């Protein structure tokens, strides 16, 4: 599903078994890595409109990461990890029926959770919290 958006072997790619799914988000090393100005990073995940975008009308939501303050945030108690990606505390959350896949990030161990030692990969992108927290100077 999230699979081969392109090659992010430098950032998202090393999420362990995720290296085959989230891994290829394009040159995300330049996009996802800079989740500060997310409006310019996550939004340009390539033709994400065909993969990431179709999480629902996510193509309209995920694509508009400018007002990220309405999506990334409420993934459950993710508000402490994924949620603090800036004012992202309200964006990632409403991916529609995504509440069944991405939305259950509480037991992340079922979906996004198996990023393995995410604390070593996803977590060290800057200091967002403890897991997704360090995505650059993403002012928490």
UniProtKB/Swiss-Prot annotation:
Sequence repeats lie at residues 1-10, 11-20, 21-30, 31-40, 41-50, 51-60, 61-70, 71-80, 81-90, 91-100, 101-110, 111-120, 121-130, 131-140. The keyword Repeat applies. Residues 1-140 are annotated as: 14 X 10 AA tandem repeats of [MT]-F-[AG]-R-L-[CS]-P-V-[SI]-[ET]. It comes from the Eukaryota. Coiled coil: none annotated. Transmembrane segments: none annotated. Keywords: Repeat. This is Putative uncharacterized protein FLJ45035.
């Amino acid at each position: 599903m999230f699979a081969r958006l392109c090659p992010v072997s430098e950032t998202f790619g090393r999420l362990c078994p995720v290296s085959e799914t989230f891994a290829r988000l394009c040159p995300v090393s330049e996009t996802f890595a800079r989740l500060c100005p997310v409006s310019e990073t996550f939004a340009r995940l390539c033709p994400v409109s065909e993969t990431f975008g179709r999480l629902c009308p996510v193509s309209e939501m995920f694509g508009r990461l400018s007002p990220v303050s309405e999506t990334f945030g409420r993934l459950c108690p993710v508000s402490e990890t994924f949620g603090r990606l800036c004012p992202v505390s309200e964006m990632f959350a409403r991916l529609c029926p995504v509440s069944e896949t991405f939305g259950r990030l509480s037991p992340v161990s079922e979906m996004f959770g198996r990023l393995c030692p995410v604390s070593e990969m996803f977590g060290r992108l800057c200091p967002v919290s403890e897991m997704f927290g360090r995505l650059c100077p993403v002012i928490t």
